[in-house]
């Protein structure tokens, strides 16, 4: 459970319209890239020069037209905008409203970008004529600083309206000094072009990677410093709700204000007409004695309100709720996850993951610890298992599984994809089988992140892979190997399930004498019979024989004329009924079968007999009381993994009845 108002796991960009990375020394760049940088700079400089010849109203209209052209020719960004709008506004947002807001957003964005190139050429008087102030007393008191009492002010900015105006209004806050924290561009000439105009207005610029001490000094001296707060902050951010969905959020504004004793207020720029904007300033946000997480959450709440007031103005084409790569599970994020006290995990928008189940019972059972780890990976996670219908009852037994989608027998990949689509939106698909079919199912369903093993047969349909670990640890158990791969996605260690309470009443021992894989995994049937007789002479036992319909003759032969109490359920139980029966056993004596793995996951003590397979890799793993007993007679040719022994079956025949009887008796003595 998440503790409200607390971090629940261990763990800024500034204004600018050119989305490049951090500055790199020209000497470290290849000549071709240097040439491209130079050409981009010259092209941008020419564009800026041309735009500044135009009236600002023409820039605004031309920008709207260009924005609508981009809206028309880039459907991917339209989809991203609508996706973000659905997150923010939820089911109340109709498709028509989403389309209208998206179209208006592209028009506003184009207009504001072109105007941001024109604004540095305006005089102070011309710029003032284009601006008005909402909550002007807040602007005067906390940004201009009339009521700041010598304290600095951190202006929490966002990509809202014409956000570049924030870097052009230093003259409006005089005599206070003004600055902004920014992320330097990789292209040094472009970086200089962007910052030249800001500095011409008297705004000091601080590279967030190198010059934060300068920003802190300005604040301590009573200045005002702008910091962007609304971009995806990656591993540097705190994961907290924005419109109820977890997003990585920069704590820089809050920490800078608290560290320097500065005031903190939000400033946004709304578009209200033809080349006209309103600057909105919030009242100061309390910081003294509060956690950085709580202060940052307040900024998110204020941003939500601004977006609701002017939805077309926010930067919807930014992937604000970006899915991290490769660690989309958040147990190891640097700054942790934070939920305010008024929000519970049930209030969060779900992060939906679809896991394609293995097709075999044993493999599915060995995947259960990994499903527990995935579920613990983030508080908003909703875990759905896509399972063959025959295994659906198993997954419904697992508390960490929220939903099960059954694959009807003989369903085509396209039909399964349709089933997935009808179930709703999924953020991630994780494929446990290595089959091409499983990859086709989720690819056809349009799930954006599709993950499987590096050796997956449908790897070309995946966009993230997990590296197997068995080549580094050849003796790694299959369940541990899968857990090691799941950890590559950011999963924590799985929780240990609660201990099973042994059933009271008559002593019921299960017998599973078959193995669908083949006779090489079956201890001789007559020896099972001898063990049953030996134990029955010592204790009163109800023997229950379990197995598949194909093994019904084995059950009949084993039960025939048995002198004690025996129930033959071979081929007579559904998986649900088998689970119920297993829960009533004090012990299961079995070959290496899916039923063995099922008993293991249910916490039923097991005496397991291995022959052609390797117990180190696929034996029972759960901790039970009494502990599991694994019996095998090691010979030079096992494990061979053959379905039938081509020689003398020595690995099974040399495992004696006395050895197995002793193991059962010892296990029962620990579980009276």
Language model: regions and residue ranges:
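Low-acidity, Ser/Thr- and Arg-rich intrinsically disordered low-complexity segments
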Residues: 6-15, 25-28
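Compositionally biased, intrinsically disordered low-complexity segments enriched in Pro/Arg/Gln/His
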Residues: 26-33, 672
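Non-catalytic C-terminal accessory region of glycerolipid acyltransferases
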Residues: 73, 100-103, 147-148, 172, ...
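Catalytic core of membrane glycerolipid acyltransferases/transacylases, capturing the structured
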Residues: 151-209, 235-238, 386, 392
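Aromatic (phenylalanine/tyrosine) cluster motif
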Residues: 18-20
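Catalytic machinery of carbohydrate-active enzymes
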Residues: 5, 44, 75-78, 106, ...
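Short terminal hydrophobic/aromatic SLiMs and anchors at protein ends
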Residues: 1-2
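Membrane-anchoring hydrophobic helices of lipid-metabolizing enzymes
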Residues: 33-157, 192, 196, 202, ...
């Amino acid at each position: 459970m998440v503790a409200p108002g607390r971090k629940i796991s261990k763990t800024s960009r500034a204004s600018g319209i050119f989305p490049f990375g951090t500055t790199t020394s020209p000497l470290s760049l290849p000549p071709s890239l240097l040439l491209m940088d130079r050409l981009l700079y010259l092209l941008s400089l020419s564009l800026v020069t041309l735009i500044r010849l135009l009236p600002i109203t023409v820039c605004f209209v031309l920008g709207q037209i260009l924005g609508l052209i981009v809206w028309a020719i880039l459907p991917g960004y339209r989809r991203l905008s609508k996706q973000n709008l659905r997150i923010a506004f939820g089911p109340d947002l109709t498709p028509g409203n989403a389309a209208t807001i998206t179209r208006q957003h592209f028009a506003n964005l184009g207009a504001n970008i072109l105007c941001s190139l024109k604004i540095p050429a305006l005089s102070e008087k011309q710029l003032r004529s284009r601006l008005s102030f909402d909550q002007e007393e807040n602007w005067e008191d906390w940004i201009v600083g009339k009521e700041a009492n010598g304290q600095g002010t951190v202006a929490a900015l966002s990509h809202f309206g014409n956000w570049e105006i924030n870097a052009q209004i230093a003259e409006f806050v005089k005599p206070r000094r003004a600055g902004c924290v920014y992320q330097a561009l990789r292209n040094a000439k472009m970086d200089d072009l962007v910052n030249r105009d800001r500095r011409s207005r008297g705004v000091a610029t601080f590279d967030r990677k190198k010059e934060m001490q300068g920003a802190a000094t300005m604040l301590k001296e009573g200045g005002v410093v702008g910091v962007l707060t609304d971009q995806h902050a990656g591993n540097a951010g705190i994961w907290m709700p924005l419109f109820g969905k977890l997003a990585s959020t920069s704590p820089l504004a809050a920490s800078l204000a608290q560290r320097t004793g500065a005031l903190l207020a939000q400033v946004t720029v709304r578009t209200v007409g033809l080349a006209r904007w309103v600057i909105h300033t919030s009242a100061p946000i309390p910081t003294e004695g509060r956690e950085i997480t709580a202060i940052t959450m307040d900024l998110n709440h204020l941003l939500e309100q601004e977006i609701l007031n002017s939805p077309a103005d926010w930067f919807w084409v930014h992937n604000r709720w970006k899915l991290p790569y490769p660690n989309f599970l958040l147990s190891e994020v640097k700054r942790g996850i934070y939920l305010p006290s008024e929000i519970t995990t049930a209030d969060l928008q779900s992060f939906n993951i679809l896991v394609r189940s293995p097709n075999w019972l044993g493999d599915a059972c060995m995947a259960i610890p990994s499903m527990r780890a995935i579920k613990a990976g983030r508080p908003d996670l909703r875990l759905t298992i896509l399972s063959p219908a025959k295994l659906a009852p198993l997954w419904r037994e697992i508390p960490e599984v929220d939903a099960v989608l059954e694959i009807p027998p003989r369903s085509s990949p396209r039909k399964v994809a349709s089933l997935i689509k009808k179930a709703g939106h999924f953020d991630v698909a994780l494929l446990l089988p290595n089959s091409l079919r499983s990859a086709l199912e989720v690819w056809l369903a349009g799930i954006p992140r599709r993950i499987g093993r590096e050796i997956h047969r449908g790897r070309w349909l995946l966009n993230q892979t997990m590296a197997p670990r068995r080549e580094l640890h050849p003796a790694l158990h299959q369940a541990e190997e899968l857990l090691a791969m799941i950890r590559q996605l950011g999963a924590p260690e799985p929780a240990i399930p609660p201990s099973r309470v042994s059933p009271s009443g008559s002593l019921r021992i299960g017998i599973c004498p078959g193995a669908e894989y083949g006779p090489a995994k079956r201890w001789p049937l007559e020896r099972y019979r001898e063990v049953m007789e030996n134990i029955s002479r010592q204790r009163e036992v109800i023997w229950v024989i379990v197995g598949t319909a194909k093994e019904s003759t084995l059950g009949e032969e084993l039960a025939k004329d048995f002198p004690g109490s025996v129930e033959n359920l071979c081929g007579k139980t559904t998986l649900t009924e088998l689970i119920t029966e297993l829960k009533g056993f004090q012990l299961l004596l079995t070959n290496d079968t899916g039923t063995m793995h099922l008993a293991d996951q249910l916490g039923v003590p097991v005496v397991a007999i291995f022959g052609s397979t390797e117990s180190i890799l696929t034996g029972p793993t759960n901790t039970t009381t009494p502990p599991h007993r694994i019996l095998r007679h090691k010979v030079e040719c096992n494990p061979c993994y053959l379905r039938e022994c081509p020689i003398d079956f020595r690995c099974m025949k040399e495992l004696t009845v006395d050895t197995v009887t002793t193991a059962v008796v010892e296990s029962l003595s620990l579980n009276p």
